[in-house]
Every structure is written in C-alpha cells, then in structure tokens.
C-alpha cells in the first residue's frame, strides 16, 4: 500500500507546477520535552518539506535518532516513538529533496561521531560549490554515505585541523558557498548559522529556560515560545549552558533574503521583519490591482496560496471576492493505484470549481506565481467548463524566467514558461482571455516601499532577473544528483 501511495504522489507531481519549498529546521535546548516539542515544531513547518522527517536528541551521554519517510504527524505521533528519543536537547528536519536522492539515508538530521565528540546537523538550502568540494574531499580519502550536500559540511568539519569545534565549524563555513541555514548540536552546544547573505531564513526564540532555532516563527508559536529575533545574515549563534553568544565571522555584507519567502514559501502567519507573510501578500495583490485591473465580476484565488493576494486585489479594485475554486487537501494520501484514467483527471484531483458561483461571470483568477503553466492551463479550462464567461489571469509576482540554485526545487530554465515565451504566447498556452504579472518595481514597492537598488538589490530576486547573488558553480539538477551518486559509490568502494 505504501508503494501505491508513493507512486501516486510521484505521478501527481506532473500536475503541480508550483515552486517547491526548501526544507525546515528546528532545534531546542534544555527541556525534558525536547523530542515532543521538536515534533510539534516540525509539524508547524510541514509546508517546507513533506518527503521525510527526522529528529536527533542528546541526553548528556548518548545521541538518539529517528528518521522516516512521510509527514511528521504520521511518524512522530506515538508516545513510544518520542520516548525513544531521550534527552534535553534536540534538532529536527523536514525534507524536500533539492539535491540528493530521495532515500532514507539522505533524511536529516545527520549525525557524525567525530574525535572531538558527536555532531548532529540539520540544513536547509543548497551549497553551490558542493560538487566541487565533494570531489576534493573524496580524492583526499573522505567516505560519503549520502548524496546530500549537507554531508559536505560534516566532512569539512571533520577534516579541519582546528582543535575546537567552533573553530572547525567556522573553518568549514568559509569553504562553502550558497544559501543555507544550519542548526547543529554537539555534546555541549546548540548552534544556529545563517548564510552571509541571509538568503535562507532562521529565527531564534525562547521557551522558559530553553532556546529554540527554527526556520519560521510559526514553529515558535505552536510550542508557546517567545520570538526573540531573526538570526542575522552571516551570524553564528551559540547556546551553551543557556548563555547566548553571537559571532559574525564573515566580512560584513548587506542581506539579500529570498524574495519567495515573502511571496510563497513562508506560512502566512509567520513573521518576516516583524510583519506576517499574509500582510505582504495582500500588499502584492493590491499593487497587482493598481497595475493590471480590468472589468470583471469576480476575484477568484487559486487556493490556498493565492488567497491573500486575491483579497488584496479585491479590496484595492473594489470587486467581489469569491472562492470559485475549492481545494482537496487530502489528495496526497489517497489509497488508490494511479491508473492512467486516474492520472488523466489531473488537477481535478486537487481542485474543483464552485460552478454556480462562476457561471456566466467574468472572472479574474489570482495566483502567487506562474512556473510551468500546466496547472494554470487546467484551472482556466475548468473555469470555462463551469460556465465562466471570461477568465483573466493575474499573477502577484513578476515572470519567473530563471532557476534557483540556493535550495528551491524548481524546473530547469527550459521548463519555465516565461523563459522563452512572450506574454502573448503564455496567454495562448494557458487559454486565458488575458494574462498580466506584477512588475518588478511593483513587487519592491509592495514589499518595502522602495525602488529596487540596481547596484545591490535588496532581495535575492534572481528568479525574475537572472542576477544571482552567488555564482552557481555546480549544475544543481539531475546531472548533479547522478554525479553525486557516482562519487558516493566510488567513496564506498
């Protein structure tokens, strides 16, 4: 049965043209409920990765690990499982594979028994020079057990000639490049790290006498923790004996956080710069209405991620907001064999239209982004089949023309609809009456009320501009995974 479910999920991916999240991390210190609280934190971060989850704990003498495929609630919902994870310190990880094969050995957190003591690590993001470093390490005798770029960090720490753990870690950090956030646990420390540009997110909070690192503030909320602040770009925070130490080993740089945390990735109730992601998305929708409004009867969001932008659009344009599409949240857990007839249903397994709402209406369909366009094409068709008079598509971000190399699972450049097609060609492909995107200037105005700095953009906005904040050394796609697999096999022979 599990094989059937896994096969169905794999088949359904061809109907899901959204960008994919880049994993979630959680770490907590000094609490007897470390494993249970970590499971709760990971549950709140489930949207960031659904392929696998893991927790590692430390009880002062020994490390305990549990890693499984699937959702947190399906794997860490039994008391007997959590009781096995003994200790007052814990770190956890939700996986969505952006590099490395989808195998149990690639599920984090990773653990290594180094000569200086145990080390466990959970990582979100991608290292753009991971393949290069891996080749060097393998030639130097390193043996890799996984195809994940996270293990590269562990190997660099192990190889460092520095004596103390923190010095070894910093030595490793100076060798890696990319967008990343790390939570690490040793015999005596809980450590949080954010990349020099702050591309990937990390926050710190407090719960009684415990400190917590998490990818988003929603993970702090679920355990009742107080949000302290975001970990700054290039910052390393060490928690030892419940004393916080902050160091910034990298040369100072202005932050360039991933703009898609604002647009799509972060849960709507999570704080970014002390403002809910939901509010940013409403502002994007309002600005979209300012730039692209047209005569219509209804504003209809693509659920769930298109809802905030659609609300902002409706308020700004003074048009009626309706749930013209209903999402089935349980499709990923359907216990059926995916026959061709089932697969042909496509997007209807996930969405259905409220036909009496859209019938004979001019509809403005709002979504947060347009990637391949396959899902949008099917939704537009569905609305017309339900009797819509016109369907106008409005996208609350600029055209996505370039791939990501910092931890987001997304199509190659050639698969991106906007990479080579004109607006007219894209509109013809999705079969809409019209298609408009939020401008790049409108995006910046909506998010920070500023113009884009042409010399040093305030965000990592390479999806739209092709201006990468860090040179992508490695080819982070299927080719890289194959190369990593070959290197892994070579290092294990």
What spans do the regions from the language model cover?
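Amphipathic alpha-helical
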Residues: 152-164, 303, 315-333
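Secondary-structure transition/capping motifs at alpha-helix termini
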Residues: 142, 162-163, 293-297, 315-322, ...
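Conserved short alpha-helical segments that host acidic/polar catalytic motifs at enzyme active sites
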Residues: 1-233, 238-296, 302, 390
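PRPP-dependent phosphoribosyltransferase catalytic core
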Residues: 173, 188-189, 224-230, 381-493
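Short, glycine/charge-rich flexible loops or terminal/linker lids adjacent to PRPP-binding catalytic cores
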Residues: 318-363, 374, 401-408
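Flexible loop/turn segments at secondary-structure boundaries
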Residues: 33-35, 98-99, 129, 199-200, ...
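A conserved beta-strand->alpha-helix junction
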Residues: 76, 146, 151, 321-332, ...
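Extended, hydrophobic alpha-helical segments in both membrane/secreted and soluble proteins
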Residues: 299, 306-313, 317, 321, ...
């Amino acid at each position: 049965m599990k094989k059937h479910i896994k096969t169905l999920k794999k088949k359904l991916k061809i109907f899901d043209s959204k960008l994919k999240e880049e994993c979630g991390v959680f770490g907590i210190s000094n609490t007897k409920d470390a494993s249970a609280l970590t499971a709760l934190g990971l549950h709140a971060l489930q949207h960031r990765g659904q392929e696998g989850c893991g927790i590692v704990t430390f009880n002062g003498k020994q490390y305990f690990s549990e890693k499984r495929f699937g959702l947190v609630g399906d794997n860490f919902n039994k008391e007997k499982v959590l009781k096995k994870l003994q200790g007052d310190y814990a770190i956890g990880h939700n996986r969505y594979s952006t590099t490395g094969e989808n195998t149990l050995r690639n599920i984090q957190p990773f653990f290594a028994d180094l000569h200086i003591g145990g080390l466990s690590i959970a990582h979100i993001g991608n290292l753009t020079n991971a393949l290069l470093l891996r080749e060097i390490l393998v030639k130097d005798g390193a043996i890799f057990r996984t195809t994940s770029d996270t293990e590269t960090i562990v190997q660099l720490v192990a190889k460092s000639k520095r004596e103390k753990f923190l010095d070894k870690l910093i030595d490793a950090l100076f060798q890696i490049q990319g967008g990343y956030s790390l939570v690490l646990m040793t015999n005596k420390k809980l450590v949080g790290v954010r990349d020099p540009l702050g591309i990937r997110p990390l926050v710190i909070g407090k719960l009684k006498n415990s400190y917590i690192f998490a990818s988003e503030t929603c993970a702090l909320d679920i355990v009742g923790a107080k949000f302290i602040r975001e970990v700054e770009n290039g910052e390393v925070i060490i928690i030892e004996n419940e004393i916080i130490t902050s160091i910034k080993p990298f040369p100072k740089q202005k932050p360039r956080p991933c703009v898609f945390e604002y647009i799509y990735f972060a849960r709507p109730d999570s704080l970014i710069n002390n403002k809910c992601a939901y509010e940013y998305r409403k502002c994007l929708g309002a600005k979209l209405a300012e730039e692209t409004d047209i005569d219509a009867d209804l504003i209809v969001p693509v659920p769930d991620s298109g809802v905030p932008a659609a609300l902002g659009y409706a308020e700004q344009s003074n048009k009626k907001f309706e749930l013209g599409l209903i999402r089935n949240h349980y499709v990923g857990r359907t216990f059926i064999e995916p026959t061709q007839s089932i697969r042909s249903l496509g997007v209807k397994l996930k969405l259905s239209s409220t036909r009496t709402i859209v019938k004979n209406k001019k509809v403005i369909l709002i979504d947060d982004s347009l990637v391949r366009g396959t899902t949008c094409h099917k939704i537009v068709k569905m609305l017309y089949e339900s009797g819509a008079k016109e369907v106008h598509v409005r996208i609350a971000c600029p055209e996505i023309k370039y791939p990501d190399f910092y931890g987001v699972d997304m199509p190659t450049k050639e698969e991106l609809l906007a990479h080579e097609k004109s607006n007219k060609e894209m509109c013809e492909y999705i079969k809409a009456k019209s298609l408009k995107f939020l401008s790049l200037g409108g995006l910046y105005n909506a998010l920070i009320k500023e113009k884009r700095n042409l010399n040093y953009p305030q965000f990592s906005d390479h999806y739209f501009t092709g201006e990468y904040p860090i040179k992508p050394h490695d080819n982070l796609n299927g080719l890289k995974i194959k190369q990593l697999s070959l290197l892994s096999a070579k290092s294990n022979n």
